């Protein structure tokens, strides 16, 4: 898997063979980042990070700080390995923790990406917690199965079996 754009365009991101995560496809990633636009100096949270590709793509496109959260130790180790590509040019933190416990720590972000396992997470609870964690005008990007019920208020786009929904926090 490669970074699509930005200062690290083309950089290969290693993945785990027979991984339990489902990496966001390049087509979906391109669409997400086209919708988000400029990320200069943003703080980003990549929940259910898997390979970390969404966070790495954000770093390549100018984000200043990325926090990766995943509860799988193998994924966390892989993200640490892949983060060496950035050689301290971006502030990166990798956390091995359950998403719900992490969000209780009261950090705030400009952008939150979440790509939870399809059909295994209470999506309404996830959306509620992520929206409270965003800074004003922050955006929450959620990838789900297109068959899942999504809370209202976001802008959705379908990609085969996947759906991307983006919410913007306004006061």
Each model region followed by its residue ranges:
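Class I S-adenosyl-L-methionine-dependent methyltransferase catalytic core
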Residues: 1-171
């Amino acid at each position: 898997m490669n970074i699509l754009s930005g200062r690290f365009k083309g950089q290969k991101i290693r993945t785990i063979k027979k991984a339990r995560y489902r990496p966001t496809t390049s087509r979906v990633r391109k669409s997400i980042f086209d919708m988000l636009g400029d990320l200069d100096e943003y703080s980003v949270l990549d929940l259910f990070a898997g390979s970390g590709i969404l966070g790495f793509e954000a770093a390549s496109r100018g984000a200043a700080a990325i926090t990766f959260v995943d509860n799988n130790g193998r994924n966390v180790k892989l993200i640490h390995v892949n983060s060496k590509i950035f050689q301290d040019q971006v502030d990166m933190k990798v956390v091995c923790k359950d998403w719900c416990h992490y969000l209780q720590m009261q950090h705030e972000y400009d952008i939150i990406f979440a790509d939870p396992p399809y059909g295994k997470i209470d999506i309404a609870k996830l959306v509620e917690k992520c929206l409270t964690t965003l800074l004003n005008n922050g955006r929450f990007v959620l990838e789900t199965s297109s068959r899942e019920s999504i809370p209202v208020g976001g802008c959705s786009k379908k990609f085969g079996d996947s759906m991307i929904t983006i919410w913007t926090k306004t006061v």
